[in-house]
């Protein structure tokens, strides 16, 4: 009976601290979804994910929203590769405004898996029950990966807007010399100011540009470093400090890794 004590499929509206992995399908999202400082219209259903330790449930407008929810205790995966692999699915760290919005075809695929799991839970438990359920969960997660990739592409207007705001935020950070006081910008700092989760930001950027958030930060660092090295007389240490590095050696190492030249060699090429 261990399967039933560790995994359950049911409706759950209340707000609570999660002790399980949660996958829930909401038939409707109220038509409008908050995104940053604005709203986007979404009338189709959505799939949400959460991991243990997150506070979930409840609705800001007080309306009761029907959820079809799968809760899985982490112990259910012990002894299976999915116990480790599940931590690699970034969407478990997304926030509610980063819901996976499903087309009718995608919804049919996901709901079929929900029903397969429900059927298995209602059957008599045997030696294969856990194997079958875990394979269905992994199948659902793999489909979710595929569908999120599609969503990043089809909602490119939103994604490109976020990319532009990221570039503006990085420019502002360095142009205002915030780096000399606060250090190099972190992924969490950028995500917080862009009103998205760090995981969603990196996954979205990777889908658009092939590069994650940290790589974008490094690209901007190198761009600003080249400007300072070619247009000012600041020493290498002063350039490193201005860009938020505590030690010039760390700056020089990153610069050479990215450009194949040391800062000194790059500067000499302009003299």
Please describe what each predicted stretch is:
Residues 1-40:
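Generic protein-terminus/edge-of-domain signal
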Residues 37-49:
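Short acidic-glycine-tyrosine-enriched beta hairpin
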Residues 45, 189-196, 201, 205, ...:
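Append "Primarily bacterial transcriptional regulators
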Residues 61-125:
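A hydrophobic/aromatic-rich effector-binding and dimerization subdomain
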Residues 108-168:
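An amphipathic alpha-helical interaction segment
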Residues 134, 156-194, 215-234:
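A short, Lys/Arg-enriched amphipathic alpha-helix from helix-turn-helix/homeodomain DNA-binding modules
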Residues 207-246, 268-271:
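Terminal helix-turn-helix DNA-binding modules in bacterial transcription factors
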Residues 252-271:
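…primarily DNA-binding HTH/wHTH and HhH modules…
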């Amino acid at each position: 009976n261990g399967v039933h004590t560790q995994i359950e499929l049911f409706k759950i509206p209340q707000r609570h601290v999660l002790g399980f992995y949660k996958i829930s399908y909401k038939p409707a999202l109220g038509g409008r979804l908050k995104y940053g400082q604005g709203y986007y219209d979404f009338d189709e259903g959505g799939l949400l994910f959460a991991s243990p330790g997150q506070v979930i449930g409840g609705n800001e407008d007080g309306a009761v929203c029907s959820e079809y929810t799968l809760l899985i205790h982490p112990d259910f995966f012990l002894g299976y590769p999915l116990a480790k692999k599940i931590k690699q699915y970034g969407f478990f760290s997304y926030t509610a405004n980063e819901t996976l919005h499903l087309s009718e075809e995608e919804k049919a695929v996901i709901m079929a898996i929900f029903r397969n799991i429900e059927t298995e839970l209602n059957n008599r438990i045997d030696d294969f029950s856990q194997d079958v359920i875990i394979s269905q969960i992994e199948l659902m997660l793999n489909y979710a990966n595929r569908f999120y990739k599609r969503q990043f592409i089809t909602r490119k207007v939103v994604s490109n807007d976020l990319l532009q705001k990221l570039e503006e935020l990085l420019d502002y950070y360095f142009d205002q010399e915030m780096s000399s006081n606060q250090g190099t910008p972190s992924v969490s700092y950028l995500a917080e100011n862009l009103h998205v989760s760090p995981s969603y930001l990196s996954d979205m950027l990777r889908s658009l540009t092939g590069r994650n958030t940290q790589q974008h930060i490094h690209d901007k660092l190198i761009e600003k470093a080249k400007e300072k090295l070619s247009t000012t007389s600041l020493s290498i240490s002063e350039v490193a400090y201005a860009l938020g590095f505590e030690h010039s050696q760390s700056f020089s190492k990153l610069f050479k890794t990215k450009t194949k030249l040391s800062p000194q060699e790059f500067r000499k090429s302009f003299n």
